Amino acid sequence: MLVAAAVCPCPPLLVPEVARGAGPELDAARSACLDALGVLAAARPDLLIVAGPAGPDDGGPFPPGSFGSFAGFGVDLTVRLGEPPAGSPAPERPLPASLAVGAWLLGLARWDGAPAEGLGVEETLPADRCVRVGADLAARAERVALLVMGDGSACRTVKAPGYLDERAAGFDAAAVRALGSADLAALEALDESLAYELKAAGRAPWQVLAGAARGAGLGGRLLYEDAPYGVGYAVAVWS
């Protein structure tokens, strides 16, 4: 059963070594993410699952001990998602970027609670399948916590990665309201096609969260919302 969830953005720029000179611009986001992880730790889960957007070739489950690298962003930095079980070899498949950022956040927070594993959620996964995946995750253990990585639209300004789309602000506002209030129906209703057009990579992981939270009776709280670089970022906690 899901006992707590944290929603965090997943730009590699969240990692100061990647952001370099622009690092301080996301200090507030990093601080909010750490506060959100504190809520997960306080829930004393038996299992932590980090879920984030992934492409068709790097989705699916990632066992404890999976590694991620930021070499593709010009930084010699490797992270690991939890520890592999004693006596088992380290997993060979690398984490997608979203889960690597999640693993980096857990390292920053010095997570030492429940075992951590990952799930790459294909960005085009239909909403109904996302909900079913979430329900399966919640059934994995008696006390499950989710760290849900994902960004809003990438079309908030003319300098955004997807240029300016007038629909982006409204999409992000609806998503942020749903995340901040743990509104499952509103999350499940996010338009898949519009999210794809707006490059909102968080849509599928957020709908996985909605599926996991069914019947859990969790309340939501928004800790951070902004759109630096024209991309919508939000941090929220459900407990």
Model-derived regions, located:
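Internal, conserved structured core segments that host functional sites
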Residues: 87-136, 142
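A short aromatic-anchored loop/beta-hairpin motif
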Residues: 1-93
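Metal-dependent phosphoesterases centered on the DNase I-like endonuclease/exonuclease/phosphatase
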Residues: 162-190
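Short, hydrophobic/amphipathic alpha-helical packing segments
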Residues: 29-41, 45, 102, 127-134, ...
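Short, basic/aromatic-enriched C-terminal tail that caps enzymatic domains
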Residues: 229-239
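Polyanion-binding loop/helix "lid" in catalytic or ligand-binding cores
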Residues: 36, 179-225
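Active-site beta-strand/loop microenvironment that shapes enzyme catalytic pockets
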Residues: 123-172
